[in-house]
Amino acid sequence: MKTLYSLRRFYHVETLFNGTLALTSRDQETTGFAWWAGNARLINLSGKLLGAHVAHAGLIVFWAGAMNLFEVAHFVPEKPMYEQGLILLPHLATLGWGVGPGGEVIDTFPYFVSGVLHLISSAVLGFGGIYHALLGPETLEESFPFFGYVWKDRNKMTTILGIHLILLGLGAFLLVFKALFFGGIYDTWAPGGGDVRKITNLTLSPSIIFGYLLKSPFGGEGWIVSVDDLEDIIGGHVWLGSICILGGIWHILTKPFAWARRALVWSGEAYLSYSLGALSVFGFIACCFVWFNNTAYPSEFYGPTGPEASQAQAFTFLVRDQRLGANVGSAQGPTGLGKYLMRSPTGEVIFGGETMRFWDLRAPWLEPLRGPNGLDLSRLKKDIQPWQERRSAEYMTHAPLGSLNSVGGVATEINAVNYVSPRSWLATSHFVLGFFLFVGHLWHAGRARAAAAGFEKGIDRDFEPVLSMTPLN
């Protein structure tokens, strides 16, 4: 029987509830956790826990590579990406790979390379995960003290936090370098309907970048989700990357202040709950971003936003009826308001009809027709370009509506197509995952606080039903 080198490892707040120190096995008798508690069995086995995390990373990267190649294999260049149920290729296209003017795909080879690179990486991670889970040392503290840790060692934990922050900062700078030096990224606002361009004039003004954080989250303001030019997005990544790297260096060099030592719970389960809370926030923000923002998520690849499809419909019928002789500036609708054009509460000229509620929308195909006071009547009469008509007609018929059975469009629409927008999928999935992560945050935070107070929340270990059932084997 293998006895661990030091008893200190068993004095952190997640106590083992069986009173034994032998960790030769990973069953309920030796760890206090049943098989379905997963990595909880590895709380004190830093080497095995490393294996679990590396293997998990391998699974994630394998999915990315395999799904990437699957999308490449099924991709039809003649159809827009958003009509093909793709969620990975739009991200690669947004980074400027394989696309040209108007978001047209001119080369799918970079997408193939991306998939293969992820598959190769996943094999390396998978090998590392299996090695550390099965063959490597159970604990790292004795052999590799730099990689070892004790959960309640506050200084070591903030050092690990610092390393993670530096890696996140470097990740932010990868996007900056791609946009500045390595071919640029796709700009949906480029003249004539979008193109790949290098970002030359970064927005680094703190009043602009941090002004987004001070905006209201509601219509017309839209908090950080309202960002609508790439200079601000890349400048924001410069700020964020710098803050993460400097914060990481700070956390590596310093020890937690007394107030932080008192205020926070210092245990593995507490760190899990903090991480789940942060990921939950990321999920909710990503949901809003992909649903409303057509700059970071260009409509050429992800399909139009909801407001964009609605405004596109109003625009399409304005174009049609104007050609048929309607005076779009003065025609009245059934409610007495303007049929095609009306005024917003603050006086701008906006599209009339039901789409009036989306008068905030900014989209690259529509902005050239605006003047200082909203939509410009003379431009609407003389200046509409064919590409704007084509794009709005396309967006009108591809609203991000749809159900789980992939029947797209408005429920009452008789000509509905079999289409569900990637925006619907990505927004819904990130909202749902963000919610589940939030519930997990509450669960683990409650357990961690209870353990710190000296008792345990959760399923009763001694009398849970499964213990009285016949073993599966």
Swiss-Prot record:
Question: What are the record keywords, sorted?
Answer: Acetylation, Chlorophyll, Chloroplast, Chromophore, Manganese, Membrane, Metal-binding, Phosphoprotein, Photosynthesis, Photosystem II, Plastid, Thylakoid, Transmembrane, Transmembrane helix
> Gene3D superfamilies of this UniProt entry?
photosystem ii from thermosynechococcus elongatus (1.10.10.670)
Compartmental location: Plastid, Chloroplast thylakoid membrane
Q: What membrane topology does this protein have?
A: Multi-pass membrane protein
Subcellular location, principal:
plastid
Which residues in this protein are found as Phosphothreonine?
T15
For the ligand ([CaMn4O5] cluster), the binding residues are E367
Q: Does the keyword Nucleotide-binding apply?
A: no
Q: Can you cite a GO biological process for this protein?
A: photosynthetic electron transport in photosystem II
Q: Does the keyword Chloroplast apply?
A: yes
Residue ranges of the TM segments:
69-93, 134-155, 178-200, 255-275, 291-312, 447-471
- Per the record, what is one GO cellular component? photosystem II
Q: How is the cofactor bound?
A: Binds multiple chlorophylls and provides some of the ligands for the Ca-4Mn-5O cluster of the oxygen-evolving complex. It may also provide a ligand for a Cl- that is required for oxygen evolution. PSII binds additional chlorophylls, carotenoids and specific lipids.
The UniProt GO MF terms for this protein read:
chlorophyll binding; electron transporter, transferring electrons within the cyclic electron transport pathway of photosynthesis activity; metal ion binding
Residue(s) carrying N-acetylthreonine: T15
The text of the family note is: Belongs to the PsbB/PsbC family. PsbC subfamily.
Binding partners and assembly? PSII is composed of 1 copy each of membrane proteins PsbA, PsbB, PsbC, PsbD, PsbE, PsbF, PsbH, PsbI, PsbJ, PsbK, PsbL, PsbM, PsbT, PsbX, PsbY, PsbZ, Psb30/Ycf12, at least 3 peripheral proteins of the oxygen-evolving complex and a large number of cofactors. It forms dimeric complexes.
Protein name, per record: Photosystem II CP43 reaction center protein
Q: Which organism is it from?
A: Fagopyrum esculentum subsp. ancestrale (Wild buckwheat)
| Gene from which this protein is expressed | psbC
